[in-house]
A protein has these predicted regions:
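A structural signal for short coil/turn segments at secondary-structure junctions
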Residues: 31, 78-79, 114-115
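Bulky hydrophobic/aromatic packing residues
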Residues: 1, 53, 74, 78, ...
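Hydrophobic, Leu/Ile/Phe/Ala-enriched alpha-helical segments that form helix-helix packing faces
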Residues: 23-24, 71-75, 107-114
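Short HxH-centered metal-ligating active-site micro-motif
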Residues: 57-98
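Divalent-metal-activated hydrolytic enzyme cores
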Residues: 1-2, 100-142
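Residue-level recognition of the N-termini of beta-strands and the immediately preceding loop/turn
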Residues: 34, 82-84, 118-120
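Short beta-strand segments
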Residues: 37-39, 87-89, 122-124
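Domain-start "cap" segments at the beginnings of catalytic or binding domains
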Residues: 1-67, 128-142
Length: 142
């Protein structure tokens, strides 16, 4: 008997947070990662989660430029209306620190530069999972 993959419909921020909670709980992380989830134009999540490990420091300008090219390639493959969403996970307790906010700023900027649709970036630590809205990320100094 095969198990059905997890494919929720994500149309709102609440649904996105619920999907991330389902995928990340129980919380507790041994390293810093960036997680990518693809959402189809109809809001259905693709049954594949991508993890980029060792994402400790926010990307440099050169790394962000490479990521923009990667996102452009994905945008072309996903087609119109698809979007890519992100969650940063790391060990430790509490809400966002300056590096988390720098990661969120970088992800928002890369998506904007690549023309890739995205939603609110999320952060998961050992004891919390929270959204990092663009206005909050941009309000913090670089």
């Amino acid at each position: 008997m095969s198990e059905n993959p997890y494919r929720p419909t994500v149309r709102t921020q609440a649904e996105l947070e619920r999907a991330w909670r389902h995928l990340m709980e129980p919380l507790g992380f041994g390293g810093h990662s960036l997680w990518l989830m693809f959402i189809e134009p109809d809001g259905r999540v693709l049954p594949h989660l991508t993890q980029i490990e060792d994402a400790v420091r926010p990307p440099t300008g050169e790394e962000e430029a490479s990521f923009v090219e990667f996102l452009r390639h994905l945008r072309d493959r996903l087609g119109s209306g698809g979007r890519l969403v992100f969650l940063r996970s790391r060990p430790g307790r509490g809400g966002p620190n300056p590096d988390d906010l720098a990661w969120a700023r970088s992800l928002y900027a890369a998506c904007r530069a690549a023309g890739m649709e995205t939603d609110v970036v999320h952060l998961a630590t050992d004891d919390t999972l929270v959204p990092l809205p663009m206005d909050v990320a941009l309000a913090e100094p670089a």
